[in-house]
Amino acid sequence: SIKVQEMGEKLAELNDKYLRLYSEYENYRKRTNLEKADLLINGSREMMKAILPVIDDFERALAATEDEGVKLIYNKMLKILEQKGLKAMEVKGEKFDENLHEAITRIPAAEEAMKGTVVDVVEKGYYLNDKVLRYAKVVVAF
């Protein structure tokens, strides 16, 4: 009968609308979860980046003092930051790598084997969760 056929068509139409809405909702949910995760990661990144100059100042202060209290505070702060994924780059003596280092200046190499090697670090570089947070500013032998 025509009535049953109309009901069948209406049911198919409503089912189609339902599936589309459900699909849209799932996509929205996934997108907002990704945005939230991205916000947390980038917020953490920006916070860590803002703290790096404080770490630099702390290290300069440590070089000028023998105060054990200052050393304890520095070590405690560094340990917390490391637990959050911060890691200093160890680059002195390594081959220069433009993906990790920023060459501030170049000096003549004392020997052939030293060419292209980082001979001094002007400003430490850091990783955050194994991604470069700040490039190491270095002096390279040529």
Tell where the protein language model's regions lie, with residue ranges:
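Charge-dense, E/K-rich amphipathic alpha-helical interfaces
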Residues: I2-N99
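Short flexible coil/turn linkers enriched for glycine and charged/polar residues
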Residues: A12, E98, M114, K131-V132
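Structural signal for conserved beta-strand scaffold positions within catalytic alpha/beta enzyme cores
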Residues: A88-E90, T105-R106, D120, V140
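Short, conserved loop-to-beta-strand elements that form functional interface hotspots
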Residues: E94, E111, V121
